[in-house]
Amino acid sequence: MIGRLRGAIAEKQPPHLVLDVNGVGYELEVPMTTLYRLPHVGETVTLHTHLVVREDAHLLYGFYEKRERELFRELIRLNGVGPKLALALMSGLEVDELVRCVQAQDTSALTRIPGVGKKTAERLLVELKDRFKAWESLPGTFTLVSNGPNHADPVASAESDAVSALISLGYKPQEASKAVSAIKEKDLSSADLIRRALKGMG
């Protein structure tokens, strides 16, 4: 299994990216929380990875932090949660935000994510609560940490990147475009645009 990759970012097309590792391009799908923190195309990054093997494809998922990968692995173990829904959950919420939702059994944040209704949110929170209790015994797993530097995308492409990211989360193209266009602040990074758009659609 491929557990970690270090290389230069060759392409960024949310939620996908291509990592050039010694001349070999690895295509990965990443949550928006990882995408927010990636450097520019051409710069080097290390990603923790998880490989899903299917009959018709080998799918590689990348994460900025190891604990994000561990959360992804926990999520896809849950009944009815595949990689797509797991990435949507992790794109809509930071790890610590999701942990707080589980601890408080708060469904409101989860139901803002496409594909997650109230019943699904309630079930996920109940199933995750016991798993997170086990995680709390692991040093550093849930300590609140800084997200690190936020490498803003070029302003000219920020809006299109944000729209693409929202579409990848399950929103319709018209909804995504409308939500981004409704944001009045100028010169925001794609990460900030995505966050504001998600709040506006919540």
From Swiss-Prot:
Span list, region Flexible linker: 144-153
Gene Ontology CC terms, in alphabetical order: cytoplasm; Holliday junction helicase complex; Holliday junction resolvase complex
Record bears the keyword Electron transport: no
Segments for region (Domain III): 154-202
Domain I: annotated segments: 1-64
Tagged with keyword Ribosomal protein: no
CDD domains attached to this UniProt entry: UBA_RuvA_C
GO biological process: DNA recombination; DNA repair
Positions of the UniProt region annotated as Domain II: 65-143
Record's comment describing the protein's domains: Has three domains with a flexible linker between the domains II and III and assumes an 'L' shape. Domain III is highly mobile and contacts RuvB.
Record text on subunit structure and interactions: Homotetramer. Forms an RuvA(8)-RuvB(12)-Holliday junction (HJ) complex. HJ DNA is sandwiched between 2 RuvA tetramers; dsDNA enters through RuvA and exits via RuvB. An RuvB hexamer assembles on each DNA strand where it exits the tetramer. Each RuvB hexamer is contacted by two RuvA subunits (via domain III) on 2 adjacent RuvB subunits; this complex drives branch migration. In the full resolvosome a probable DNA-RuvA(4)-RuvB(12)-RuvC(2) complex forms which resolves the HJ.
Family from the record: Belongs to the RuvA family.
Protein name: Holliday junction branch migration complex subunit RuvA
Organism: Pseudomonas syringae pv. tomato (strain ATCC BAA-871 / DC3000)
